């Protein structure tokens, strides 16, 4: 007796707790403006089971699956009805289909896989349990791929909107939700269940979508498309707000202009405008603008409009730009002509008048600006890291002991320098100078997947320019390798391009290594430093020529000046970023470091290629890196004047293009080696890596956040 009372005492609060949750869920469903409950399928089963006065143990997988099969295979019994029902699925068979043991707990991943199988069962209930089809013996991948291939004319890797419409239509009929008044649209479902609908549903998103559909179906909630008014609604709304039917008068237009001017402060919106409820009937009872509806697929049963829905009551709905365009035109991403703009203007005015869309927000709390100590401390550490990164080019010294390997590795980094220098100028500096490198924040909605090309369209056009440069480089290089003989190539280089070969590159690494000298046969020199006579390969190097090679060539000076300006500008950018916030400064440091390391490594290779010793090249690289500190402190003190930065970027871009395309690229074409095809591969590898690095930086640098 005591145990029975104790059990009853324990059950009463549990019963009332779940009962209260169920009542709250039902009360939320009565308001069509609120999204459904965010609980998953398991939570829905617990709620339904507790409403019947029983308790479901979470660790009993067999009981959970049995209850789920009962609710799915017998939809009439969801709320306690006991109509006769034939079940063909067994709990152990269902668990076997998704690869789960009976003793295992049912977690979210398992319930989502089970939802996929049950959704397939709903779509193929007539054939699922027949002995002919043998569908009960398939594995999970079969059911998943079958749902993705629901329509033969659609992409088999994604579940399109049309296929989702088919699933919703069948599910609505299967669970007999046609007469239910409580419905939620796909947009509300995404918000409530954290479903991202920016792209089509793939095999990763499908299990979550299947769980949501089953959850809402068991809760007697139907899912429809987001409802849109027809094109005439917006004009009719404006006229109705002035109590006009067909004509507006001058005072009405003056009042309209005044309303538009006051929309900056929505709190001052007139009560009359707020109280206007659209009672404008839809033409031909058309509530939804299904401009993209395919012929032969009638889903009118899903979007069945009841008598009270003949009027558009969602006056203050916020429509995205693409949704507004879709209301009027078939292609929401097509350009809008002047005539089409006349049609869409009332919709824009409607959104302004009703203050439907809240001000754009980045969703983050603005932090307090960094203190002076933080700005100078963090920024100094960041530039120090950049300086250390720029010194990585010194690693090329280890290859100077073997002339042939040194030559090959050097050409790899020369190609990397050409790719990073030209890529930095074309993909980063020039767009920034022209003002097209700004970060544009787009709203997230169902068409967001198309933004990837539109947002970075200028980058793909610039990549076309780079493709032209690379294509002609390949033609010239292959012509040199396949057609020109080594002797002709040497004569061409000495006579036309004034590139001298077989001159030594001394690697003075210390007093003990002065005897170990290596010569570079791929030396870049300016016209003033070169003799116009052809130098035979067997000709010994004279001391005068050796001393002359120790001088600093014009190319080395240009690289020093260009790098100094670039690092100076980088320092100003970092100073400006840390003046804004610590997070922005760290993100900018990471972004600059991504292209600074390969850039400086390539520059170090070119400095060695001009005939400088390793020590001098290292010193010049270090001196150019120090200018970042000057730019940093000037940027911190002057808040990095954007006008000054733009001019620095413009001059730097010109220098980078000249260095990479005029001085360095011709050398890559005519350099000779004993292994020409291996060098050709390394040169291409360096070029492509440099361009790819700067392309990825241009696309994703604004997404680096901390």
Curated annotation (Swiss-Prot):
Catalytic activity: Zn(2+)(in) = Zn(2+)(out)
InterPro entries from the UniProt entry: ZIP (IPR003689), ZIP4_12_EF-hand (IPR049406), ZIP4_N (IPR041137), ZIP_Transporter (IPR050799)
Tissue expression notes: Highly expressed in brain.
Record keywords, A-Z: Membrane, Transmembrane, Transmembrane helix
Membrane-protein topology: Multi-pass membrane protein
Domain of life: Eukaryota
Annotated Pfam families: EF-hand_Zip (PF21116), Zip (PF02535), ZIP4_domain (PF18292)
Protein location: Membrane
GO BP, sorted A to Z: neural tube formation; neuron projection extension; zinc ion import across plasma membrane
Motif segment (XEXPHE-motif): 595-600
GO cellular component annotations of the record: membrane
Transmembrane parts of this sequence: 204-224, 379-399, 408-428, 463-483, 554-574, 618-638, 647-667, 679-699
Main location: membrane
Membrane side Cytoplasmic: residue ranges: 225-378, 429-462, 575-617, 668-678
Start and end residues of each stretch annotated as Disordered: 516-535
Ranges of the Extracellular topological domain: 1-203, 400-407, 484-553, 639-646, 700-706
The keyword RNA-binding is annotated on this UniProt entry: no
Sequence ranges of Basic and acidic residues compositional bias: 526-535
Job of this protein: Uniporter that promotes Zn(2+) import from the extracellular space to the cytoplasm across the cell membrane. The transport activity is temperature dependent. May play a role in neurulation and neurite extension.
Similarity comment text for this entry: Belongs to the ZIP transporter (TC 2.A.5) family.
Name by which UniProt lists this protein: Zinc transporter ZIP12
């Amino acid at each position: 007796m005591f145990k029975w009372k104790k059990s009853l005492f324990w059950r009463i609060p549990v019963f009332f707790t779940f009962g209260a949750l169920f009542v709250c869920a039902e009360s939320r469903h009565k308001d069509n403006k609120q999204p459904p409950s965010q609980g998953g399928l398991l939570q829905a089963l617990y709620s339904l089971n507790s409403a019947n006065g029983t308790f479901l143990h979470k660790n009993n997988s067999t009981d959970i699956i049995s209850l789920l099969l009962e609710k799915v295979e017998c939809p009439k019994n969801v709320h306690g009805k006991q109509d006769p029902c034939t079940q063909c699925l067994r709990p152990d068979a269902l668990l076997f289909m998704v690869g789960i043991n009976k003793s295992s707990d049912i977690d979210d991943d398992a319930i989502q896989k089970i939802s996929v199988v049950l959704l397939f069962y709903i779509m193929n209930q007539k054939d699922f349990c027949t002995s002919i089809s043998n569908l009960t013996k398939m594995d999970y991948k079969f059911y998943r791929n079958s749902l993705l291939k629901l329509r033969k004319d659609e992409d088999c890797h994604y579940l399109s909107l049309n296929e989702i419409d088919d699933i919703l239509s069948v599910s609505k009929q299967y669970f007999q939700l046609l007469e239910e008044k409580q419905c939620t649209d796909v947009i509300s479902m995404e918000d409530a269940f954290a479903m991202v609908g920016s792209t089509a549903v793939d095999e990763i998103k499908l299990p979550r979508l299947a769980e949501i559909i089953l959850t809402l179906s068991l809760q007697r909630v139907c899912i429809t498309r987001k409802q849109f008014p027809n094109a005439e609604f917006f004009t009719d709304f404006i006229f109705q707000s002035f109590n006009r039917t067909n004509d507006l008068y001058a005072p009405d237009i003056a009042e309209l202009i005044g309303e538009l001017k006051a929309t900056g402060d929505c709190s001052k919106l007139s009560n009359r405008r707020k109280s206007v409820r659209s009672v404008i009937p839809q033409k031909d009872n058309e509530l939804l603008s299904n401009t993209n509806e395919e012929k032969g697929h009638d889903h009118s049963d899903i979007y069945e409009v009841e008598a009270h829905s003949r009027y558009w009551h969602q006056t203050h709905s916020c429509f995205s730009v693409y949704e507004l365009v879709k209301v009027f035109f078939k292609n929401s991403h097509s350009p809008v002509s002047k005539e089409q703009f006349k049609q869409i203007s009332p919709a824009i005015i409607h959104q302004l008048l009703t203050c439907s869309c809240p001000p754009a927000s980045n969703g983050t709390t603005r932090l307090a600006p960094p203190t002076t100590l933080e700005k100078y401390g963090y920024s100094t550490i960041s530039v120090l890291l950049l300086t250390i990164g720029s010194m990585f080019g010194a690693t090329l010294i280890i290859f100077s002991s073997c002339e042939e390997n040194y030559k090959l590795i050097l050409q790899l980094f020369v190609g990397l320098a050409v790719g990073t220098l030209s890529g930095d100028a074309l993909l980063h500096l020039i767009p920034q100078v022209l003002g097209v490198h700004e970060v544009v924040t787009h709203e997230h909605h169902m068409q967001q997947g198309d933004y990837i090309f539109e947002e970075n369209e200028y980058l793909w056009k610039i990549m076309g320019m780079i493709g032209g440069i690379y294509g002609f480089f390949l033609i010239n290089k292959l012509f040199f390798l396949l057609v020109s003989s080594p002797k002709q190539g040497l004569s061409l280089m000495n006579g036309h391009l004034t590139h001298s070969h077989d001159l030594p590159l001394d690697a003075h690494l210390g007093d003990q290594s002065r005897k170990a000298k290596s010569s570079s046969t791929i030396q870049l020199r300016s016209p003033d430093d070169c003799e116009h006579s052809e130098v035979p390969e067997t000709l010994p190097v004279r001391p005068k020529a050796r001393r002359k090679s120790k001088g600093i060539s014009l190319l080395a000076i240009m690289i020093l000046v260009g790098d100094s300006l670039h690092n100076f500008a980088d320092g100003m950018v970092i100073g400006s970023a840390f003046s804004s916030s610590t997070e922005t400064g760290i993100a900018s440091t990471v972004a600059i470091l991504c292209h600074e390391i390969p850039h400086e490594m390539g520059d170090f290779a070119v400095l060695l290629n001009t005939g400088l010793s390793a020590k001098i090249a290292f010193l010049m690289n270090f001196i150019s890196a120090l200018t970042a500190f000057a730019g940093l402190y000037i940027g911190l003190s002057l808040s990095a004047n954007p006008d000054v930065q733009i001019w620095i970027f413009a001059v730097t871009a010109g220098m980078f293009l000249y260095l990479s395309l005029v001085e360095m690229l011709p050398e890559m074409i005519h350099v000779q080696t004993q292994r020409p095809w291996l060098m050709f591969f390394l040169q291409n590898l360096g070029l492509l890596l440099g361009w790819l690095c700067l392309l990825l930086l241009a696309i994703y640098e604004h997404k680096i956040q901390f």
